[in-house]
Amino acid sequence: MNNDEQLEFLINYLLDERSESIDIPKTFSEKRNLLRSLMNMRHPSNISEEFLRIQDEFLSRETANKNLTSVEDISLSSGKIMLWQGDITTLSADAIVNAANSKLLGCFIPMHNCIDNIIHSASGLQLREECNRMIMLQGGDEDVGKAKITNAYNLPSKYVVHTVGPSIERGMRVSSDDVKKLERCYNSCLELASEYKLNSIAFCCISTGVFNFPQKKAAEIAIRTVKDFLNSNETSLNHIIFDVFTDKDYDIYKKLLFGN
């Protein structure tokens, strides 16, 4: 199968699962968005080996065609701490951190632009399946501040570390408990990465999206917690990357880390 044939196979498989028949769009980009939407909406359940094989070929080819960044390519650093602006799904670190929700199953909203959706969409349906197995095994939702590690599947990283950050109601102040919970997120991820003897981990901006944690406050907590961890622990980690997407977050982290 060529790229277009694989795309149509994946779409038709997921539509058949839903017992739906729709007019498939004509252009590749529209069909690609449809596939992502169907993947986003799919609840964890058994899926054929043929689907997974074709999905993996399709997604791994997409990943290979992206402008990937290795940890060694990141120039803005201070000791073990690094700052990078870009799409976390293009970063070849040992692990990337996903700001998850308590169900740990990814975002089910089609084409939503949250980090949880973006990571699951690029990784493939196996990521949701693995997360579901962990949630079923523990018998309930994931607590705020804890961390779980999974394979990264079709991402350039080796692992994804999932953590649930604190959520702030709009208009409410950040409490001392919220601060402790966010600190715990970073510590849990760093402890887990060290347990797995990883060399590098890339953090997204935990809780600052739909969870409404103020960006500057969150950055201050993130940087302080990482520095405290490095000062207090023996760790395999040599590269801890703060990955930001927006210019505003980049400016905040750059000023806090480097003073300019």
Curated annotation (Swiss-Prot):
GO MF term set: hydrolase activity; metal ion binding
EC number(s) reported in the record: 3.2.1.-
Boundaries of every Macro domain copy: 68-260
Binding positions (ADP-D-ribose): 87-88, 101, 115-116, 207-211
Comment on bound cofactor: Binds 1 Zn(2+) ion per subunit.
Similarity field: Belongs to the MacroD-type family. Zn-Macro subfamily.
Name of this chain's protein: Protein-ADP-ribose hydrolase
